[in-house]
């Protein structure tokens, strides 16, 4: 999935909250949010700014998961599926350029709802597709404040 950056320190010592500081240059064993927008970009000058705004929408959700005490493995899995969701949203804005002008929150809410996320063509199997949809539903509930993560 996304590019993973490993820390030079022992990953077992990193708390989930510390992992979320990758965007502040501290590194982590699985998250490096600053590189996500670039990894999604088919057209860097157009896609990176949109991608960066999407990442900013993901950060409070990931932070809430970390604060709720979710395990590193669960955080990593959620992050992987969020990375996939971001890629699908960017693919969509390349097909519908007018959507590039939408605020990131609105753009995301056009792609996720109480049933899950957009079609994800890179799912290896039904289990991955179901897990992806579960994360999208959880993000939707978080963004619409219907439920905490």
Protein language model annotation of sequence segments:
Residues 1-149:
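Charge-rich, intrinsically disordered N-terminal extensions
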């Amino acid at each position: 999935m996304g590019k993973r950056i490993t820390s030079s320190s022992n990953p077992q010592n990193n708390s989930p909250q510390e992992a979320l500081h990758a965007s502040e240059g501290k590194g982590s064993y699985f998250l490096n949010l600053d590189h996500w927008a670039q990894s999604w970009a088919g057209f860097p000058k157009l896609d990176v700014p949109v991608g960066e705004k999407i990442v900013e929408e993901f950060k409070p959700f990931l932070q809430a998961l970390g604060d709720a005490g979710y395990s590193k493995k669960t955080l990593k899995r959620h992050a992987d599926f969020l990375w996939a969701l971001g890629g699908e949203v960017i693919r969509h804005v390349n097909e519908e350029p007018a959507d590039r002008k939408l605020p990131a929150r609105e753009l995301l809410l056009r792609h996720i709802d109480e049933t899950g996320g957009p079609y994800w063509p890179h799912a290896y199997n039904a289990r991955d597709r179901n897990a992806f949809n579960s994360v999208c539903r959880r993000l939707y509930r978080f963004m619409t404040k219907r439920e905490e993560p």
